[in-house]
């Protein structure tokens, strides 16, 4: 579909961890003739969308499918935890950050048997400890973790964790919300049974559409598992798609049109070229922070290449809210950290941006520091 852009929308550079900066063509893809989402025409659009979502992670359409849900990324965690656990089994959450903690909270809410295997937020999981836990708990049927813990930017070893899950006959689910369609993923090579994401991050579309890419055979088997949710049930949503070509409940129509356009732009840019662009942005963020003297939370070689978490300066004139507002008024959004034991802020390499945007940002950011009297280079005690 040829998207007409009747005027240029004011462009903001979002350096928060999603939603991300979008193109005008994705924005205007939402302006379409009204349509009932139960029409066959719209069902055909969703079928193509679902197939593309599998192809992005190199899934075989004979083995993998995608299932759409209306909601934020957290709905995917809810769906997988409550839908994919057989009766009498338990979940192992490999947890080194806020987003794996969210999976633990979902388990607690539903009363699902689970093990919260916690590691420090600034360290990767110890694979020997993970294997020991699996060996000692043969009733673990599902292992879950987060690919890129967005609160810190640490990259978790999903391929190795998936291999361990499969060694002990468990299904492996991964929250790939902040890596999908950015950092290349291959579900078969990476030992992933289910991954999940939302349209507003790597795809550079809008909030409200989330999706799970997973093994069709496991979804079908889950039809016999306990039904713990009416809306957030994976098999029910999958089965309704397969029988009718429709979402079980009302879909976010305009967001789906925008996501289809975002997918077109993804394929036009290409997986490797897109990842190279995100890498350029990420490197430019590091260069800017290094020049000012900021310190990272996570070791450079353990970062996912998409989120930089930086420590607050030990400077009485540093005020994140004031610096944020200064940048925001000039078209740049920065974001607070999500680490309970450290004061941090985050700069992210998501969205339709390139390294020139980062250079422009650091001019404004440095102005803000100077305006409020923050010492440069940054001081730490």
Kindly label every feature range from the protein language model.
Residues 1-40:
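N-terminal "arm"/small-domain region of PLP-dependent enzymes with the aminotransferase-like
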Residues 21-22, 200-287:
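Active-site C-terminal subdomain of aminotransferase-like
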Residues 29-79, 83, 98, 102-106:
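Conserved N-terminal alpha-helix of the aminotransferase class I/II PLP-enzyme fold
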Residues 75, 83-139:
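PLP-dependent aminotransferase-like
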Residues 125-181, 194:
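Active-site phosphate-binding strand-loop segment of PLP-dependent enzymes
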Residues 188-200:
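Conserved active-site segment immediately N-terminal to the catalytic lysine
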Residues 295-326:
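Conserved PLP-binding catalytic core of the aspartate aminotransferase-like
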Residues 343-381:
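PLP-dependent enzyme catalytic core of the Aspartate aminotransferase-like
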